[in-house]
């Protein structure tokens, strides 16, 4: 059975509480449960990880290459400035799909740039929690192509 990793970055543990007008009322626990269920219907095991710490995210990206076949990543605010996470993604051979709940290109100007997207297989933004499912579908297609 294929194993994939879902990584959520800083403040995503506050889903359902933080800026519900932007991120919705759903919680991280709900998102993770829904994603695991969706993955299971595709015959895939999905493990979930969330951290507010850049180094922890870098560590799990490095470790993922030997354990998982691909990563779905929401780097949160690290998207816009973490060259360290960008370099971690670039250093591994498995595909990474970047996902964002909101459309980062329609928000504050400092959110418009993603330093991580260029080293990801693709980026999905603005579809709420459904964007994570789109990322899962895209990642599975990417793995089929390989």
From Swiss-Prot:
The record marks 18 as: Transition state stabilizer. It catalyses: 3-dehydroquinate = 3-dehydroshikimate + H2O. It comes from the Bacteria. InterPro entries: DHquinase_II (IPR001874), DHquinase_II_CS (IPR018509), DHquinase_II_sf (IPR036441). The keyword Ion transport does not apply. One of its GO terms (molecular function) is 3-dehydroquinate dehydratase activity. Pathway: Metabolic intermediate biosynthesis; chorismate biosynthesis; chorismate from D-erythrose 4-phosphate and phosphoenolpyruvate: step 3/7. Keywords: Amino-acid biosynthesis, Aromatic amino acid biosynthesis, Lyase. One of its GO terms (biological process) is amino acid biosynthetic process. HAMAP family: AroQ (MF_00169). NCBIfam families: aroQ, PRK05395.1-2, PRK05395.1-3, PRK05395.1-4. Belongs to the type-II 3-dehydroquinase family. Homododecamer. This is 3-dehydroquinate dehydratase. It comes from Bacillus cereus (strain ATCC 14579 / DSM 31 / CCUG 7414 / JCM 2152 / NBRC 15305 / NCIMB 9373 / NCTC 2599 / NRRL B-3711).
């Amino acid at each position: 059975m294929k194993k994939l990793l879902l990584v959520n970055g800083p403040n995503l543990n506050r889903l359902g509480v933080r800026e519900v007008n932007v991120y919705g009322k759903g919680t991280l626990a709900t998102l993770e449960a829904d994603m695991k269920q969706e993955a299971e219907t595709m015959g895939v095991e999905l493990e979930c990880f969330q951290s507010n710490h850049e180094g922890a995210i870098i560590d799990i990206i490095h470790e993922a290459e030997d354990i998982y076949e691909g990563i779905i990543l929401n780097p949160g605010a690290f998207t816009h400035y973490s060259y360290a996470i960008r370099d971690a993604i670039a250093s591994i051979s498995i595909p990474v799909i970047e996902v964002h709940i909101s459309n980062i290109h329609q928000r504050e100007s400092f959110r418009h740039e993603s330093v991580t997207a260029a080293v990801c297989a693709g980026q999905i933004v603005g579809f709420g929690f459904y964007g994570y499912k789109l990322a899962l579908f895209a990642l599975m297609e990417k793995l089929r192509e390989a």
